[in-house]
Design a protein with these regions (language model features):
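Active-site neighborhoods and metal-handling regions in enzymes and metal-associated proteins
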Residues: 1-216
Length: 216
C-alpha cells in the first residue's frame, strides 16, 4: 500500500511498483490516516523503521497498534541494503563517473581572479552533462532528471577552515588553497556519493599549509 498526496497521484501511478495506491488531501477527512486502520487490522506483528518515521505518523501508529506488536525492522533492512545487485553496482559506478566529471569541471574553473560561484556553476554543469549522457545511454526512465543540485560546498583562502562554507562572490587568488566538497550534491539516479578534494592555485603561498595537508 502506497499512501500519497493527491497532487502526486499521477506520478505514483506511473512510477510505483505497487498495485495499491491511496491518495489523500490536506484538510479532507482523516487525510493520510484513512487507510492505516484497515492495513494493520489483524496483524500479529507490524514492522516499522522508528527513526525514519515522521513524528506525526509514529504518534498515530502508536495509538493505533499495541506496543508489543510493533517491531523495528531497521537492522534487517540495513543488512539487506548491504547486498548490491549488478544493476545497483552499475548505478554506483555511473554515479562515480558523474562525481569525477564534477571534480574535473570544478578544478578546471579554479584560477587566480575567479569568484567562487563560477566554480560552483562549472561543477553543476559538468555533472549534469555527464549524467544526461549516462541516462541516455543506459537507462529508460524518462522522468529521471540529470540535474545535480544542492549548494556547492567550497572554501578558499582565509575561509578554508570553514568546513561547510558555500560558494560565494569571494575572488580566489594565486597561492591560495581551494577546498571542494561534493557530499550531498553528487547524485545520479537517486544514488549519492560523498567526497572532497583540496587544490592550490599555482605555487603554495604558505608552505605550512602543505605540511598540514600531508598530515590530513
Amino acid at each position: 500500500l502506497l499512501i500519497t498526496p493527491t497532487i502526486d497521484l499521477n506520478t505514483a501511478q506511473a512510477s510505483a511498483r505497487d498495485d495499491r495506491i491511496a491518495a489523500w488531501n490536506d484538510g479532507m477527512g482523516n487525510e493520510w490516516r484513512v487507510e492505516l486502520p484497515a492495513a494493520v487490522k489483524g496483524a500479529a506483528r507490524i514492522a516499522i523503521e522508528p527513526d525514519h518515521m515522521p513524528p506525526s505518523v509514529r504518534a498515530y501508529v502508536n495509538g493505533l497498534v499495541e506496543a508489543q506488536k510493533l517491531e523495528a525492522i531497521t537492522p534487517i533492512l540495513a543488512d539487506m541494503r548491504m547486498i548490491k545487485s549488478e544493476q545497483e553496482l552499475q548505478l554506483a559506478r555511473h554515479a562515480g563517473q558523474v562525481a569525477n566529471a564534477m571534480m574535473t569541471g570544478g578544478r578546471a574553473a579554479i584560477a587566480d581572479g575567479v569568484p567562487e560561484y563560477e566554480v560552483a556553476i562549472a561543477t553543476s554543469q559538468a555533472g549534469t552533462r555527464k549524467a544526461a549522457e549516462l541516462l541516455a545511454a543506459h537507462y529508460d526512465d524518462a522522468d529521471m532528471s540529470p540535474n545535480t543540485h544542492f549548494l556547492q560546498i567550497m572554501a578558499s583562502g582565509e575561509t578554508i577552515t570553514k568546513t561547510h562554507h558555500r560558494a560565494t562572490t569571494r575572488v580566489m587568488n594565486r597561492g591560495e588553497p581551494v577546498f571542494l566538497c561534493f557530499c550531498g550534491m553528487t547524485n545520479f539516479h537517486r544514488f549519492k556519493l560523498g567526497f572532497d578534494r583540496t587544490f592550490w592555485i599555482g605555487d603554495i603561498a604558505d608552505e605550512t599549509q602543505a605540511d598540514v595537508y600531508e598530515v590530513a
